[in-house]
Regions:
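Active-site phosphate-binding strand-loop segment of PLP-dependent enzymes
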Residues: 73, 77-127
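Substrate-binding/gating loop at the entrance of the active-site cleft, primarily
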Residues: 32, 52-68
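PLP-dependent enzyme catalytic core of the Aspartate aminotransferase-like
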Residues: 10, 16, 20, 272-304
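Structural motif of enzymes handling amino- and sulfur-group chemistry
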Residues: 176, 193-212, 216, 220
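Conserved PLP-anchoring active-site segment centered on the Schiff-base-forming lysine
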Residues: 40-59, 217
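Conserved PLP-binding catalytic core of the aspartate aminotransferase-like
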Residues: 216-225, 229-262, 272, 284-286
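Active-site PLP attachment segment
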Residues: 147-180
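Conserved N-terminal alpha-helix of the aminotransferase class I/II PLP-enzyme fold
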Residues: 1-32
């Protein structure tokens, strides 16, 4: 545990480096995004808190809510009007929990409007940046970073297993939040700290990620969407690299055809997504090529 013998200067330097890049008061490293989410929510809420969350938040956020003693209610996906209705009805302490980019749909909430409502109704906000980190914003650190010092921002979680390509997560927030987590967050306290080798590599990976030109990823995504058959229904958003191609009962057959052509594209089935919304989840990377996109389109368009 970092509280006994697992702490070292390189790890503290990494936390300070990440916080400084975001112009944030502090950052605390967890071993994974899952451990961050289940570790933070029970600490920042209590029995008098009501958590108001988007219906499509991560399983890790849902588990964190279950581990907390807070009450919780759900609003329909990205529906700001429904969120406002709930905020108007609920008394006492309130915490809004959202993601900057949703993992299955690839779309985003109106984060600015969420913070406006939080300010209006005296609610805190927690944002998960798992699928936004590494793609947009200053230093490729997502869309939520501009709200880090907003008075209603409680925490922003930056998992490192996606764009950074390693493991772990930073919880970014006030210095008081960091001290509370160090002393009360069970998934931080009762686990082995990261190795020095991992921390050194993370620093290198983050420095690389922050300098990357990500426009190529969005160019590939545009190439794909512009050439995809109009018979397909898809879900995506402006800030994510994910496109959810709704394929219902054809999903597994399409996945097999793509895998046979060495295209690693996964089928997402019920109950991960609701019945009738089964899909091929396409995630674009900077190592993908235009030829790979052409192959992907050829197979998909031939199966309309």
């Amino acid at each position: 545990s970092r509280l006994i013998s697992g702490n070292f200067s390189e790890l503290e330097d990494l936390e300070e480096f990440f916080a400084k890049k975001l112009e944030a008061p502090s950052a605390l490293y967890y071993n994974s995004g899952y451990m961050a989410n289940i570790g933070v929510l029970p600490v920042i809420t209590d029995r008098s808190t009501t958590i108001i969350c988007d219906e499509l938040i991560h399983a890790s956020l849902r588990d964190g809510i279950r581990l907390s003693k807070a009450k919780h209610v759900v609003f329909s996906h990205n529906n700001i009007s429904k969120l406002e209705e709930l905020l108007l009805k609920i008394e006492g302490k309130k915490l809004i929990v959202i993601e900057s980019v949703y993992s299955m749909d690839g779309d985003s909430p109106d984060i600015e409007e969420v913070f406006n409502l939080a300010e209006k109704f005296g609610a805190g906000v927690m944002v998960d940046e798992a699928h936004g980190t590494g793609l947009t914003g200053e230093n490729n650190l997502g869309q939520a970073q501009q709200f880090i010092n907003h008075p209603n921002c409680v925490a922003i979680v930056y998992p490192l297993g996606k764009s950074a390509g390693l493991s772990g997560a930073f919880v970014v927030g006030s210095k008081m939040l960091k001290q509370y987590l160090i002393n009360f967050s069970r998934s931080f306290i009762y686990t082995t700290g990261p190795s020095k080798q991992l921390v050194i590599q993370l620093r290198k990976q983050l420095e690389t990620m922050m300098k990357k030109d990500t426009s190529f990823i969005f160019a590939l995504k545009s190439q794909f969407l512009n050439s995809l058959s109009s018979h397909y229904q898809y879900i995506t958003g402006p800030y994510g690299a994910v496109v959810g191609l709704i394929t219902a009962d054809k999903t597994q057959n399409i996945e097999s055809a793509l895998m046979d052509d060495n295209l690693f594209v996964k089928a997402i089935l019920s109950p991960t997504v609701q019945r009738g919304m089964e899909r091929i989840r396409i995630c674009f990377h900077d190592f993908n090529t235009k030829n790979e996109i052409d192959s992907l389109l050829s197979i998909l368009n031939s199966r309309v």
